[in-house]
Amino acid sequence: KQGFARVLDEDEMTAETMKKEIFALYENKEKYVVAMNQIGCGVSKFEENYINRFKRTDDYNQGIFFYIKDIKTNEIWSATDDNNCEQFTVQFMPDRNQFEKTEEEIKTKFKVTVDANEPVEIRRLEIQNKTQEEKILEVTSYFEPVLSRKEQDYAHQAFNNLFLVYGYDEENDYLTVKRKKRESHQKELYLIAKMQTNSEKIGETEYEIDRAKFTGRNNFGIPKAVQNSTPLSKKIGLTTEGIV
């Protein structure tokens, strides 16, 4: 495998260019795979099970996304989308995928790696403030968990979602998702999603598992909760449209 890098000029950042079906694939010994394209859309898989929802035929971006919001200016951008930014660099390398961009004088470096021996992926976001003023930033991650084979999800998405059970570990500050068995011979699958920071954090971690509350109805762009800085509900329960 070889990595490559190139800087996209502003006139190259078209929807057609950025949605090329060029995927970087990484697989570890535990058959954990991450596949991504040039704007961060894609899927993570464990064996034959999709971690997040992804369907190439859908006309909106799908994957595991990180949104950054400048509280003072209300500017919002994704760590992996071009978003008409000042500079955008993508690198697909043997050991990681890396996205670098500069937006509103905030430079971000987003790295995606897979542990060599365990079914674990790490998404690391580094933020550099290039201004002389203090910045308060909101960082929000978002994806739709699946934990099943894609055929099951494609056949009946709402029914497939009914087998997901959500939880939150307050002591260790992480969300859990369990896929219940449909048949006795099947294994139960578990997912843990955790965010942590080395910088100063204001307030407690917030979370939401209801897609409609987070994104808003029929909204496939920046989630409404991110746009409005709406406090997330921090409630665990049943949902037919779950998110993490």
PLM segments and residue spans:
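Anionic coordination/interaction segments
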Residues: 1-244
